[in-house]
Amino acid sequence: MGNAPQRPILITGGGRRIGLALAHHFLTLRQPVIVSYRNEYPSIEGLRQAGATCIQADFSTDEGILRFAETVKSNTRGLRAIIHNASAWQAEKPGTPLSETLACMMQIHVHAPYLLNHALEELLRGHGHAAGDIIHFTDYVVERGSDKHIAYAASKAALDNMTRSFARKLAPEVKVNAIAPSLILFNEEDDAEYRQKALNKSLMKIVPGEKEVIDLIDYLLTSCYVTGRSFGVDGGRPLN
């Protein structure tokens, strides 16, 4: 058993922002990583050079999701964790059919984690008590809704609910939790006015950066007891 290879952590949407930071964090710890990505970024080549297994995937169809799952299975016989980071933020807007917006949000935030959790369940099980993890990235809007991103908020709320359902299904071998962030990082194109307005929405008045999320994930992965819970990383924003 001591010579058994480490099981990789699977991170969906690992080519940018939090997913990318997580991948590099684990690689620094000599933890094997598999990342999914849709578009080729320079960061993907950097991950490859650092030792990550990078798999291009299209989650816009169920077939693409299941094809990705089969590729993962061909690369490893076990998984330490699945971190569902892949996301899209699409608002209702004139010219785009509402049904299309809803379908897109449900596809990436509900179909993908639902199908992957089922398809890869066997890779997470069989390694002992609380030896596997699934982490869903939801959003603080699950609590309050959103008048401009209704489909997005609804899809993240569905993912939040699935956290508890999968926790019931997979315990005690696999823990399943959710992280509900608000503003973690600015985009480069965000101007000063937008940044100040965004900062004022939280009680803590800062942008914490990826480390706040990384530290929480490290805690969840090392816990032997916490499952079926959602953790807000929002600076008290729902209270403001």
UniProtKB/Swiss-Prot annotation:
Catalytic activity reported? (6S)-5,6,7,8-tetrahydrofolate + NADP(+) = 7,8-dihydrofolate + NADPH + H(+); 7,8-dihydromonapterin + NADPH + H(+) = 5,6,7,8-tetrahydromonapterin + NADP(+)
Q: Which terms does the record give in the GO molecular function aspect?
A: dihydrofolate reductase activity
Please give a single GO biological process term from the UniProt record: one-carbon metabolic process
Q: Where is the signal peptide?
A: none
Q: Where is the active site?
A: 152 (proton acceptor)
Q: Which top EC class applies here?
A: oxidoreductase
Explain the purpose of this protein.
Catalyzes the reduction of dihydromonapterin to tetrahydromonapterin. Also has lower activity with dihydrofolate.
- Protein name as catalogued: Dihydromonapterin reductase
Supply the gene name: folM
